[in-house]
């Protein structure tokens, strides 16, 4: 069964998960950060997620602030079953978290509760971790504090860099999200608390 989804994400890391959603579910809209000026010509550059959305003619929203009333009203009108968030880059207010019936599901690039917040991939490499991975979780008001649903692990190579690990994890994240959505739909998703 296809879920009606809104996708929120910005950098290249988020693109494989968006692609997986497009391939297996119905993506009603994509939300990403505003375009950035690049270089001296001040040409506007689309975030990678927007480029992918445009390729598939999916409506794109780029609010300066996700807590803008007008934007939240738009999301309520769209009324998705689920909102999937991957490296979006803004904190979401409760008024957004409460819209979808299956909640807002975040794909995070670490094995939570380790490496909450920014740069989890870089930190795993810098700290010499033997393994890291992806966690899917329910979003709450705090930063990366919500209940976890699924995890997938990856072992770091001797020569692992943040770049090589990033590329592994972004593919793993797309796969794990699809599994998580299946569980949400079947009612088999188990919420696990993050025990600090």
Language-model regions: role of each:
Residues 2-41:
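N-terminal Rossmann-like dinucleotide-binding module
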Residues 4-6, 26-31, 59-78, 83, ...:
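Internal alpha/beta domain cores that form substrate/cofactor-binding pockets in large enzymes
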Residues 12-13, 70, 91, 143:
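Short alpha-helical
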Residues 15, 19-22, 72-76, 94, ...:
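Amphipathic, non-transmembrane alpha-helical secondary structure
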Residues 23, 54, 76-77, 98, ...:
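Solvent-exposed polar/charged
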Residues 36, 68, 140:
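Positions that flank functional sites
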Residues 36-56:
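N-terminal beta-loop-helix "entrance" segment that forms/cooperates
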Residues 82, 86-196:
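Donor/substrate-binding cores of folate-linked one-carbon enzymes
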